[in-house]
Amino acid sequence: RDLRMSRGLGDVYKRQGYEYVFEMDADFSHNPQDLPRLYRACSEEGADVAIGSRYVSGVNVVNWPMGRVLMSYFASKYVRFITGLPIHDTTAGFVCYRRRVLETINLDGIRFKGYAFQIEMKFTAYKCGFKVKEVPVIFINRELGTSKMNSSIFGEAVFGVIRLKWNSWFHKYPTVDKEMK
């Protein structure tokens, strides 16, 4: 993910005035029929961030090689352990954000570029006091194209998560206005 593109998209999302912003893979690994469930988690169940989770109720991944499943699953366990983030699928890219989450988070301050971008967004939302909820989904591997996973993305996630936690001890996160909730 190009950092400039991510920042630019954040600005576009905020300017459009939508109350809810969805992020999903365009290759249909994320089922569009699950969008209403993520929406309801935010609009009716009080979540500020709803995550389409592959791991909240077991492992729900179809057609991934076993090595990829294990790497993804244990990466999320690692992130939970290091950060204390109460999320089972920390790298999920199927997410519904309330507008106020994107308005509160300093999107220019998001540093991760690869899959770790997902971790940093969720961690920052959590540290700001937003309610994060996981919604079980089934993730189906793409039929066309290839993964962007490489050693630099992997290294960013492994070492970046430690740096993210370390920096959180010294960083003052904006807090959610209780009246907004």
Regions found by a protein language model. Give the residues of each.
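Short, hydrophobic secondary-structure boundary micro-motifs
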Residues: 50, 89-90, 134, 170, ...
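The conserved acidic donor/metal-binding loop of glycosyltransferases
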Residues: 25-29
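Terminal low-complexity segments of carbohydrate-biosynthetic enzymes
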Residues: 33, 44, 100-101, 129, ...
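DNA-recognition element of transcription regulators
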Residues: 119
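Acceptor/aglycone-binding surface of glycosyltransferases and processive sugar-polymer synthases
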Residues: 7-22, 32-115, 142-159
